[in-house]
Amino acid sequence: TPSTVLVTHLLLAHSVSWPLLANEMAVFLIGTGFALLANLYMASNQQDIDNYRIQVEEQLRKILLRFEYFLKAGDGRNDATLIKELDTILQEALALVYLDHSNHLFHQTNYHIHYFEMRQAQNRILEDMAGNINNCQLAASESLILARLFSKTAQQLSQENPAHELVEEIETCLAVFRERPLPKTRQEFETRATLLQLLRDLETFIKLKVEFYQNYQKVQAS
């Protein structure tokens, strides 16, 4: 490092004089200056990061709309292919933003890191939900309510959307579910339990986004 070179030169000189100090300081400043300039002008990966963000949000949208279809149709066949594809995209995106963060001294990439980590956490929730979707064989009235929520969530995935209204709507739906008549058959009971779990998972999914938005609201406004 420049500081190591400076100390080594002073030790080898066996003396300290103003001309020597001035010369070594000039060497230090030149070396540090070139390093900073190289860092500032190093190519940014911003365009690639933005492209990954678009891919991630589009893939999330496809998954949520697929869930909506399964709930409306009462068809639980789901191999989670889209979720696996999204996991691959997220791994690639995170590798890029980690690299971008290490390569830029003044380039702020914490926002991007936390954004893709938030989406990764959401995808893990979707993976659990996909398994529960497979158990929803009954096209119950509650299924249609939840399907509508999946559709609305798919429409509000943008990083700029705070998603507060979705959380409130889920709370309302939970209250509605509690007031409905008790299931009459074992199948209805199991489906109701699965639907409630899906609703709670969806609430967690959305709250991850709400928390992220609250933490980075100033970044979005700047």
Indicate where each model-derived feature is located.
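A transmembrane helix-and-boundary motif of multi-pass membrane transporters/channels
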Residues: T1-I83
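Short, functional N-terminal and low-complexity linear motifs
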Residues: G31-A35, I89-E92, Y115-Q120
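Alpha-helical rod/repeat scaffolding segments in eukaryotic adaptors/tethers
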Residues: Q46-R53, G74-I83, H104-H112, C136-S143, ...
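Oxyanion-binding "anion nests"
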Residues: D87-L105, Q120-N123
